[in-house]
From Swiss-Prot:
Binding site residues for S-adenosyl-L-methionine: G153, E154, S185, S209, L210, H211, N285
Keyword Methyltransferase included in the entry's annotation: yes
UniProt protein name: Probable dual-specificity RNA methyltransferase RlmN
Source lineage: Bacteria, Thermotogati, Deinococcota, Deinococci, Deinococcales
The protein's Enzyme Commission number: 2.1.1.192
Gene: rlmN
Top-rank EC class of the record's enzyme: transferase
Organism listed in the record: Deinococcus deserti (strain DSM 17065 / CIP 109153 / LMG 22923 / VCD115)
Length: 343
């Protein structure tokens, strides 16, 4: 039996008006069973149910943060587990989705990296996170207008499935998201960055998890070599910008005594010369056994001031969902106060 959400909307079964009805049930109404699609003929519903399924999850658990963020812990039909994070703001609703079970990049300060790599998610398993979160929050799927591929996994190492998921997210008859509100984050896969630049029909935004401006420090905190060298990453970033004209976000997790020295701020400014970019400084979010601490507020401010004085567009990102284990770098299938529900 095929998973319907793995298909591009243009390849959905049924024809013409009936296909549009099917797409509306799935992506606008968020219906999870074919029986509920009452304006489709009974014969069509029966045939769909024989050939396709709509739900890749065996179980869904939630952990709610005091700041309104919600971590969703999904158990897939094969027993594997992964997570997504819902972040409501006054002016928007954002979701952070996973592209893998675990992650092969093994960033030393990231709880997901400590899990190791399980498997790639399919396009439908990525998209289904949005539908499941919308259902869990009692909102329509299209009310979630911002999406970041920043959950578990290195999206560039699951490239084809992630691109298919992005096309489904953007499709006007599916979730209809704006390409300007979808961001893909990578630890620095130069080949993938160049491939993304060539995806003319997408136009989604790019964020690079740099975390250090010098090779010695970067190899210490990203030890597996999943990413390219800083020089290779920045060359690919410049190629990407030359093709797309888009600003690139650089993510920089602040690790006390590791990558927060002022000479590293100066070097980072040098590395970014000529690139239209924005740097997000992210205080490290704690997790058991990490062996790292966040930089102090004073050191983060000094690092910020040094970059700003050099003309770098920079901000400090305050993570949400820390108390639920849902903040950046904390996703590791932990369940403080989880609430379980049937999928």
């Amino acid at each position: 039996m095929e998973f319907l959400l793995d298909l591009h909307p243009d390849a959905y079964p049924l024809e013409g008006f009936r296909r549009r009805q099917l797409l509306e049930w799935v992506f606008v109404q968020g219906v999870g069973t074919f029986d509920a699609m009452t304006n489709l003929p009974a014969e069509a519903r029966a045939e769909l149910a024989r050939s396709y399924h709509l739900n890749p999850f065996r179980e869904i658990e939630t952990v709610r943060s005091a700041d309104g963020s919600v971590k969703y812990l999904f158990t897939l039909t094969d027993g594997r587990q992964m997570e997504a994070v819902y972040m409501p703001y006054l002016d928007r609703k954002t979701i952070c989705v996973s592209t893998m079970v675990g992650c092969p990049a093994r960033c030393a300060f990231c709880a997901t990296g400590a899990m190791g790599f399980g498997r790639n998610l399919t396009p439908g398993e990525i998209v289904a996170q949005v539908l499941a979160v919308a259902g869990g929050e009692g909102i329509g799927p299209r009310e979630i207008r911002n999406l970041v591929f920043m959950g578990m996994g290195e999206a560039m190492l699951n490239y084809e499935n992630t691109m298919q998921a992005a096309r489904i997210l953007l499709h006007p008859q599916a979730l209809g998201m704006s390409k300007r509100r979808v961001t893909l984050s990578t630890v620095g896969i130069a080949k993938g960055i160049r491939q993304l630049a060539a995806e003319d029909d997408l136009g989604i935004k790019l964020a690079i998890s740099l975390h250090a401006p010098d090779e010695d420090t970067r190899q210490r905190i990203i030890p597996t070599g999943a990413a390219n060298s800083i020089a290779e990453i920045m060359a690919a970033a410049r190629d990407y910008q030359a093709v797309t004209g888009r600003r690139i976000t650089l993510e920089y997790t602040m690790l006390r005594g590791i990558n927060d020295h002022l000479w590293q701020a100066e070097l980072l400014a040098d590395v970014l010369q000529g690139l239209v970019s924005h740097v997000n400084l992210i205080p490290m979010n704690p997790w058991d056994g990490s062996g790292f601490e966040s930089s102090t507020e004073d050191q983060i401010q000094a690092f910020y001031d040094t970059l700003e004085a050099r003309g770098v567009d920079v901000s400090v990102r305050r993570s949400r969902g820390k108390d639920a284990g849902a903040a950046c770098g904390q996703l590791a299938l932990k369940r403080p106060g989880a609430v379980t529900g049937a999928a």
